[in-house]
Amino acid sequence: MDAVTVYHGKISRETGEKLLLATGLDGSYLLRDSESVPGVYCLCVLYQGYIYTYRVSHTETGSWIADTAPGVHKRFFRKIKNLISAFQKPDQGIVIPLQYPVEKKSSARSTQGATGRREDPDVFLKTP
């Protein structure tokens, strides 16, 4: 999971929401560990000022699955990256297609902006 750039690990729901709201872009998304269910992940998506959270889990057979809107056919994916790619398309049972990945930067990287101030080394938004 660490190879997935939108995976932020064990961050709180509040921290994830702040990261998404800071983008201001509907369709911004990230993955984090679930706080309430061990071994489960949360796919968090910004839409119209609200954060929508979908549980993502790794099945016993090694597939990945996401809990989506009721009535939507459950799909299984071999890799988490395939799940993310599928949800970048419309009508997949989530509120809006995944559009703007909020990626976690390596903590070893630190940048200075044009103003000379240190920018946040932990997160950046990747636009298509």
Swiss-Prot record:
PANTHER family: PHOSPHATIDYLINOSITOL 3,4,5-TRISPHOSPHATE 5-PHOSPHATASE 1, SH2 DOMAIN-CONTAINING PROTEIN. One of its GO terms (cellular component) is cytoplasm. GO terms for biological process: adaptive immune response; cell-cell signaling; cellular defense response; innate immune response. Residues 67-92 are annotated as: Interaction with FYN SH3 domain. The modification N6-acetyllysine is found at residue 89. It is found in: Cytoplasm. This is SH2 domain-containing protein 1A. Residues 6-102 form the SH2 domain. The gene is SH2D1A. Residues 116-128 have a biased composition (Basic and acidic residues). Interacts with CD84, CD244, LY9, SLAMF1 and FYN. Interacts with NTRK1, NTRK2 and NTRK3. Residues 103-128 are annotated as: Disordered. Cytoplasmic adapter regulating receptors of the signaling lymphocytic activation molecule (SLAM) family such as SLAMF1, CD244, LY9, CD84, SLAMF6 and SLAMF7. In SLAM signaling seems to cooperate with SH2D1B/EAT-2. Initially it has been proposed that association with SLAMF1 prevents SLAMF1 binding to inhibitory effectors including INPP5D/SHIP1 and PTPN11/SHP-2. However, by simultaneous interactions, recruits FYN which subsequently phosphorylates and activates SLAMF1. Positively regulates CD244/2B4- and CD84-mediated natural killer (NK) cell functions. Coiled coil: none annotated. Signal peptide: none annotated. Keywords: Acetylation, Adaptive immunity, Cytoplasm, Immunity, Innate immunity, SH2 domain. Its main location: cytoplasm.
